[in-house]
Amino acid sequence: MIDARHTVSTACQFINVPMGIWVDEKGRVVRPAEPAWTTDQTMKIGAKSIVTEGTAYLTALRDWVANGERSKFVLSDEEFARRVKPRSQAEMEADASFKLAVYFHEKGNNDLAQKYWAKAESLNPDDWNYHRQDWSFTPDQAGKKWLEKFQKLDGSYYPKLDIKP
């Protein structure tokens, strides 16, 4: 799916890729946004590493597909609520700024688009989707910009997968 306006990522609180949510047959979200890898991998980049946990995620996903609401990986309402954080004022302003940037870009006003992308990125620097969208317009610089941002991280590039039963 192509989500150029980031409608799905906003609604589901996706801040990086790949991320997933689990939606059951009744339309109920039973697991909120979390990293959704398919392989285990450790990528060393300079002094930092990106660690993915695909085996654990796929094991849980397969259990849910096989067992549905009886899966030990379906979250209780209380645990689900604990994991979904309310959006802060800055995050909501970042989302509005991002949408303005997309609008101005589509209308050909790249100066205003760039202004609002920069605002979105500064208001919610943890949302890598904003940065990636901005970098997509300068593909020759995207890798360099990604590496600079990655090297400045205090924490992890991806949140730790919390998929225990």
Where are these predicted regions, by residue range?
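Short, internal strand/loop/helix patches
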Residues: 1-17, 21
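Non-globular targeting/processing and membrane-anchoring segments
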Residues: 30, 35-165
